[in-house]
Amino acid sequence: MSKTEKAKVYFTDFHTIAFGDGLPTKLKKLIRKAGIGSIDMKGKFVAIKMHFGELGNISYLRPNYAKAVVDVIKELGGKPFLTDCNTMYPGSRKNALEHLECAWENGFTPLTVGCPIIIGDGLKGTDDIAVPVAGGEYIKEAKIGRAVMDADVFISLTHFKGHETTGFGGTIKNIGMGCGSRAGKTDQHSSGKPHVKEKLCRGCRRCQKECANGGLVFDEASRKMHVDAEHCVGCGRCLGACNFDAIEFDNNAANELLNCRMAEYTKAVVDGRPNFHISLVVDVSPNCDCHGENDVPILPNLGMFASFDPLALDQACVDACLAAAPMPGSQLAKHLADPDFHDHHDHFTNSTPESEWKSCLAHAEKIGLGSREYELITL
């Protein structure tokens, strides 16, 4: 695409006609029209990056949408698999066994989606690869799940929603944060070094074996591990080594810095190979699907979007959301009724005032991830 040419973003709404095509069929038509068929997938491994939802949360994308994408990829001769990487925090997705069980319980199985499910950074979240970030200002090498990078073709399938830290969770967050290994997520979230929660430490020393820098010291008297701040480099390897959630990083990176790091991680994932992106603005909960609960949607179901440009796709989804009326009774509507919230045209700031969400899009454009200028093509 030339610098003067706008990125193309394709759109269709969620309306259907009685006894006509269902939403999975509409999604198939959308991605075909958007040009997914131009990617050579014959005999190639195709990663479909999505979020399977935390246990207790039911606002994540239904497996039916994943199945629709899988069907199209198979028609094109590809070998698809669904993937996500483990979380840096305790929950139902912190290791591959629990992550898969969570995915199955939430409806994602080979039977329902038509392809295997592979956790991208392995059993403990330590199976990653260092990927250079071209033009990165904050990240020189991104720690990406190995299975994600081993794929020949990369597809993202995103549930576009609000987010308590980044303002919104779109394509860039799905890719950048989602494809980071446990250490990679730590790399983005934390500005410091870990600490050991002594009550949970069993003194097994697994974490110490993973540390290449002498950053962990075992106290023989207490039989507990401690962080040596002088030697710890904050790489996050110890996080995946602990089976007892005794090692923790503070989520203390400033929101603007977090947003910029996510954009750079996204660039590491998509650079140099075929990629295509899908985003569904549906069940727009105020918080991330990483929560074990979900609140009522802050915005109506707006539609399905697809593009080869991840930045243009996020921008189009943002613009659609900002133009929509808030849902009555939602967190956003309650905030708008508060006289302390003055910018009635910025739903994401009004929902999460400290998010600095615009910094993600601006930095993504600066580093060449894509374009914020787009042509919206409605089906």
Segment roles from a protein language model:
Residues S2-M50, L55-N57, L61-Y65, V72, ...:
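Extended, low-polarity segments enriched in aliphatic/aromatic residues
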